[in-house]
Structure formats: structure tokens, C-alpha cells
């Protein structure tokens, strides 16, 4: 019975000491991995930041190249009064004097072009 206790005590001491060593090793490995993970995250963050800056630069470049004159100015839609001398009807519309039902109105209106 005494040998069983000694054997059990010896196995217990070995298990605790080896387990403690493994625990310290595991702690060291985890520390190294978290440091590597942080460096990887920093690298990924910097890479993403560079890509976003490039994209932003491209977008700003496109905006600066766009001329204000290249865009169509605000136009007047169909059936809306327009100025005879300065028609701003949208493309496909013409500033004409109303016929029939609109003759009592005093101004011109934007109408679709007639295709003959």
C-alpha cells in the first residue's frame, strides 16, 4: 500500500510539473501569436488605408476634370412656360406659342418637336 501511495505521489508531482511547463509554454506561444496577429492587423490596416487613399485620389481627379460646361444646365420640361428669346427647353423640346386650347395664355411653352 505504501508503494502505491509513493507511485501515485510521484505521478502526481510529474504531472503537475510537466503541466506547469506546458502552461508556461502555451502562454509564451499565445503572446507571440498575438504580437504576430497585431503586426498582421497593422499591415492589413495600412494596406487598406493605401487602397482607400488611391480610390479617393481617383475620385477627386475625376471631379476636377469634369467641366461645368459639360453638364446640361437645368432645362424646362414639356408643357412648362418658356421665354421666346431665351428658350431653356430640355433636349427634344421646342419653345412654341400654344395652339388651340392654350391660345388665351400669353407666353410660349415647351412642346415636343414634330417629326415630319
From Swiss-Prot:
Please give the tissue specificity annotation from the record for this chain: Expressed by the venom gland.
Region (Disordered) spans which residues? 61-83
**Signal sequence coordinates:** 1-21
The entry lists its GO molecular-function terms as: sodium channel inhibitor activity; toxin activity
Q: What disulfide bonds does the UniProt entry report for this chain?
A: 75-90, 82-95, 89-110
Q: Which GO terms describe its cellular component?
A: extracellular region
> Where would you find this protein in the cell?
Secreted
From which domain of life does this come?
A: Eukaryota
**InterPro entries, sorted:** Toxin_22
Keyword set for this entry? Answer: Disulfide bond, Ion channel impairing toxin, Knottin, Secreted, Signal, Toxin
What family is this protein classified in?
Belongs to the neurotoxin 14 (magi-1) family. 01 (HNTX-16) subfamily.
Q: What does this protein do?
A: Probable ion channel inhibitor.
Q: Which comment does the entry carry about domains?
A: The presence of a 'disulfide through disulfide knot' structurally defines this protein as a knottin.
- Protein's recorded name: U11-theraphotoxin-Hhn1c
**Which organism does this record belong to?**
Cyriopagopus hainanus
Amino acid at each position: 500500500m505504501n508503494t502505491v501511495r509513493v507511485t501515485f505521489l510521484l505521478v502526481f508531482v510529474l504531472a503537475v510539473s510537466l503541466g506547469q511547463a506546458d502552461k508556461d509554454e502555451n502562454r509564451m506561444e499565445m503572446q507571440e501569436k498575438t504580437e504576430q496577429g497585431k503586426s498582421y492587423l497593422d499591415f492589413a490596416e495600412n494596406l487598406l488605408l493605401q487602397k482607400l487613399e488611391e480610390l479617393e485620389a481617383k475620385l477627386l481627379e475625376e471631379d476636377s476634370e469634369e467641366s461645368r460646361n459639360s453638364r446640361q444646365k437645368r432645362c424646362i420640361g414639356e408643357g412648362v412656360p418658356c421665354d421666346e428669346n431665351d428658350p431653356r427647353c430640355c433636349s427634344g423640346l421646342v419653345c412654341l406659342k400654344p395652339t388651340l386650347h392654350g391660345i388665351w395664355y400669353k407666353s410660349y411653352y415647351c412642346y415636343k418637336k414634330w417629326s415630319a
